[in-house]
Structure formats: structure tokens, C-alpha cells
């Protein structure tokens, strides 16, 4: 055994003392620090915010460094992502700048289950499952009424709140980010949001539980070349309710679809396209750039895209009308043709 291992573990344990009040609680499953002085924890009632003066930026960096050394890893501007296990068996995801906002550090701890649940308890509510004798009928789609009436503000508001996967399409300068910000404002405040951007443009209520992740390339003057795909994978370990990816450009589109299809519903993103059909086509072609998709036929990937993306909203900037930006098309997979 490495003689330094006990000292490394002791260093991690020492820096974890600031989190002991929450790590020691059996009813807490997740602990997240989005910025210094503040943490969020998830219990049976959902997410809760707690202020903590002990969680200074220096302390968080010291904890990150101690954790990296304990795992024989590095965390620094050149390697700003760390997925590891703590001495107590907890899983941790740490993100430091430039992969997150300057002056912050993102820390997500997932506590292991301390109890093995019997099947009888896990399946206690199985009678509510569709298809089981005695089960309730499928709920009607609340989006169909505003869809049929053409009440598009109500439709999109309900779509966000229902966790539909939404793609905003349009040309450069058409107002895609503006609409995405408006849609993001309808996300219920109880949710935890992870955003992924190359430049900070998405604006969320400072009081909500969210983390902004940033990617870039060496040519953009960033110290670390962290890709959107790497941040998507890291985001999945950060207990997100939903993931917002500012723009889809390449193979990361497949990772985004995988995230939306793996229990993280309600994803929102944008792409450059002039119509809903072109947006779905472009998204399919982006997926083909992913290493795991290069041998798959177009039809298979197109079917995946249409099974995951619920809604496409097309925005346009029309010259000659005061440079007016407006929604010109909405495609809803489960709806009737738009009136």
C-alpha cells in the first residue's frame, strides 16, 4: 500500500468536515455546491438551499485538490473535470474554471444507498403502472388543447413545465437564444439545471439551483480545451433535473439525445435551420458525426431524433419589418398539424 494513502485520505476527510452536517444525514441523497458559500441538498421533499460560510472558494479548491490526490488524479485549468469516489464511498463530480464560471467551483456528491430495499417495497406502487389490471387509464395530453387552439404561449409554457424536449431552430440573429432564455424562465424553480455553453448567454434566476458549464477550444484563448461532449458526460454526474445545451453543432447532438432519453427529460437546445424538418434533418446529420453513429443508417438516427425531440420551434428575423423576430413554425410530434 502506498504510505501516502492514509495521509491523502485524512486530508480529504479533513476538508469534508464542512459538509459533515449533510453527509451524515441518512435522508439526503445528493449534495451540490454551485458557488462558494452556498449548497443545495436533496432529500425526500426535493431540493433545499443552505448558506454555509465555511464553503469559501479557497476551501472548495483545497477539497478538490485533496480529492484528486487521493485518487492519483489531477484537477487544474488544463484538466478541469474530475469524477471520483470519496473515502466514504460517495461519488463526486468536480468542475473548476475555465469549465465553469470564474470565481466558482462546482461540486456534486452522490451518497450511496445504505440500505438494500426489498422488492416488495420497490414495487409497492406497481398497480399504478399502465397495462397492469386495475391501472388507471393514460392521462390526456394537456398540450393538445392549446395546440389545437393555436394558443402558442400557453402551449410552450406547458411544454416546458411538462418536461418536453424542445429544439429551437433559426438562422443567425433570428432570436434563438432570446427564445431559449424565455423558455428557460418557465422551468419550475424546484428543478436543478445544468447549462452548457461556449459563451455565457443563458440567463437563469440567481435564486435557482443551477450550474453554468463552459467549453472552448485552444484557438479561442482558453487554457483548457473542454468539449461539449465532455461537459455533457460530466453533467450527467451532477444530479441534473434537465440539461440546457446552448447550441448543437456536431456529434454532441447524439450525447444530448442520449441524455434526454435517459431520464433527464426537458432538455432545451438550438440549432441553425430554416424549418422544423430541416432542423430534424440537421440534428440527424450531426448525430452521424458521433463515433458511435458513423456506421448507423440515416433512417435509424432520424427515428431516434424524432422519438426524443418533442417540439421544434422555428424563429425568423424578417428584414423590412423593423428587423422583427418572430416564431414562424412549431412542430409537435404528438400533435395534429399546426393550424
Curated annotation (Swiss-Prot):
Protein family according to the UniProt entry: Belongs to the GSP E family.
Family matches, as SUPFAM superfamilies: P-loop containing nucleoside triphosphate hydrolases (SSF52540)
A GO cellular-component term linked to this record: type IV secretion system complex
InterPro entries: P-loop_NTPase, Sigma_54_int_dom_ATP-bd_1, T2SS/T4SS_dom, T4SS_GSP_E_ATPase, VirB11
BP GO terms, sorted: secretion by the type IV secretion system
An MF annotation (GO) of this entry: ATP hydrolysis activity
Record-linked NCBIfam families: VirB11
UniProt-listed Gene3D superfamilies: 3.30.450.90, P-loop containing nucleotide triphosphate hydrolases
Alphabetical list of PANTHER family matching this protein: TWITCHING MOTILITY PROTEIN PILT, TYPE IV PILUS RETRACTATION ATPASE PILT
Protein name from the UniProt record: Type IV secretion system protein PtlH homolog
Annotated disulfide bonds: none
Amino acid at each position: 500500500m502506498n504510505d501516502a494513502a492514509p495521509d491523502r485520505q485524512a486530508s480529504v476527510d479533513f476538508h469534508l468536515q464542512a459538509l459533515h452536517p449533510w453527509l451524515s444525514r441518512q435522508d439526503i441523497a445528493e449534495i451540490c455546491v454551485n458557488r462558494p458559500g452556498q449548497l443545495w441538498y436533496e432529500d425526500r421533499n426535493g431540493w433545499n438551499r443552505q448558506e454555509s460560510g465555511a464553503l469559501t472558494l479557497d476551501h472548495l479548491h483545497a477539497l478538490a485538490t485533496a480529492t484528486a490526490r487521493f485518487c492519483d488524479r489531477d484537477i487544474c485549468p488544463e484538466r478541469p473535470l474530475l469524477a471520483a469516489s470519496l473515502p466514504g464511498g460517495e461519488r463526486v463530480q468536480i468542475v473548476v474554471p475555465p469549465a465553469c464560471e470564474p470565481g466558482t467551483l462546482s461540486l456534486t456528491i452522490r451518497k450511496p444507498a445504505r440500505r438494500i430495499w426489498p422488492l416488495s417495497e420497490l414495487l409497492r406502487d406497481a398497480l399504478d403502472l399502465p397495462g397492469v389490471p386495475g391501472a388507471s387509464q393514460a392521462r390526456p395530453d394537456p398540450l393538445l388543447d392549446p395546440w389545437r387552439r393555436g394558443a402558442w404561449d400557453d402551449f410552450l409554457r406547458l411544454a416546458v413545465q411538462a418536461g418536453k424536449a424542445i429544439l429551437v431552430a433559426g438562422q443567425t440573429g433570428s432570436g434563438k437564444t432570446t427564445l431559449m432564455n424565455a423558455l428557460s424562465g418557465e422551468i419550475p424553480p424546484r428543478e436543478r439545471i445544468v447549462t452548457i455553453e461556449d459563451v455565457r448567454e443563458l440567463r437563469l434566476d440567481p435564486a435557482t439551483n443551477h450550474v453554468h458549464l463552459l467549453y472552448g477550444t485552444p484557438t479561442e484563448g482558453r487554457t483548457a480545451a473542454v468539449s461539449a461532449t465532455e461537459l455533457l458526460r460530466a453533467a450527467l454526474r451532477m444530479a441534473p433535473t434537465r440539461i440546457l445545451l446552448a447550441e448543437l453543432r456536431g456529434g454532441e447532438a447524439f450525447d444530448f439525445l442520449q441524455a434526454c432519453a435517459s431520464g433527464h427529460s426537458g432538455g432545451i437546445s438550438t440549432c441553425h435551420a430554416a424549418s422544423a424538418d430541416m432542423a430534424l434533418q440537421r440534428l440527424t446529420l450531426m448525430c452521424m458525426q458521433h463515433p458511435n453513429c458513423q456506421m448507423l443508417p440515416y433512417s435509424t438516427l432520424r427515428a431516434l431524433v424524432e422519438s426524443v425531440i418533442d417540439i421544434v420551434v422555428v424563429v425568423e428575423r424578417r428584414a423590412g419589418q423593423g428587423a422583427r423576430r418572430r416564431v414562424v413554425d412549431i412542430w409537435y410530434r404528438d400533435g395534429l398539424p399546426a393550424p
